[in-house]
């Protein structure tokens, strides 16, 4: 296959990886089950290769052109503000980004006008949410175990992803506000989509046929990020 016609797709390691592999499999693009130590993973389609990267790096690879396409969550995408196209919701990875606090904690104000400390992996989204509500907060960026931050005195509130809510309850936290509905989306490099439009559209049609629409796709706050699929 002519290298100019090949598609390189970045997949996020972690919670979205297996659902993404399954989604591509249903679309007839199966990853090599035993790639060994190869960084580029071949697939059943000779014109498509995959690479696996950290979730935060998917949009970086796609925006830079190191990958033509990628699969990522709208939480990471909105946090990064990457300049990429979002042509398709993929119908998996549904959850929500929420603000939460201890059940006994006053909400939405702190006693005596105290500035609330908020622990999160999403500092930009958290700050914007509270700024829109006119609530000054101090953002504390952490990379893991966000739910224990109030228990340990690191923060008063948290902003984190929630699926069932069981982890919040186990740590004595109550979901207060939904900030963003999250789901997996296909993202595309702008230049690549122009140069390889036919390949992009062919793959998108295959994925669209097996993807179930859900919330978490392109948002009104990000106009112009959706690439229409040509009929």
Regions found by a protein language model. Name each.
Residues 1-231:
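Domain-level signature for soluble enzymes in the chorismate/prephenate branch of the shikimate pathway
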């Amino acid at each position: 296959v002519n290298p100019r016609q090949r598609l390189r797709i970045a997949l996020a390691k972690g919670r979205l990886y297996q659902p993404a592999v399954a989604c591509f499999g249903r679309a007839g693009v199966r990853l090599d089950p035993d790639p060994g130590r190869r960084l580029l993973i071949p697939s059943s389609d000779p014109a498509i290769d995959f690479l696996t990267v950290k979730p935060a790096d998917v949009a970086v690879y796609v925006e830079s052109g190191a990958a033509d396409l990628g699969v990522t969550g709208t939480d990471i995408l909105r946090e990064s503000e990457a300049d990429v196209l979002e042509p398709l919701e993929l119908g998996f990875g549904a959850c929500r980004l929420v603000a939460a606090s201890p059940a006994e904690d006053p909400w939405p104000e702190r006693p005596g006008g105290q500035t609330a400390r908020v622990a999160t992996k999403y500092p930009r989204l958290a700050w914007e949410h509270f700024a829109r509500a006119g609530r000054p907060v101090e953002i504390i960026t952490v990379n893991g175990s966000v739910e224990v931050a109030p228990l340990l005195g690191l923060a008063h509130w948290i902003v984190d992803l929630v699926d069932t809510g069981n982890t919040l309850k186990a740590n004595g936290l109550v979901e207060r506000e939904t900030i963003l509905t999250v789901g997996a989306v296909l993202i595309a490099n702008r230049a690549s989509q122009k140069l390889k439009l036919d390949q992009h559209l062919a793959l998108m049609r295959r994925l669209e046929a097996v993807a179930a629409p859900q919330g978490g796709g392109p948002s009104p706050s990000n106009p112009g990020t959706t690439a229409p699929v040509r009929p």
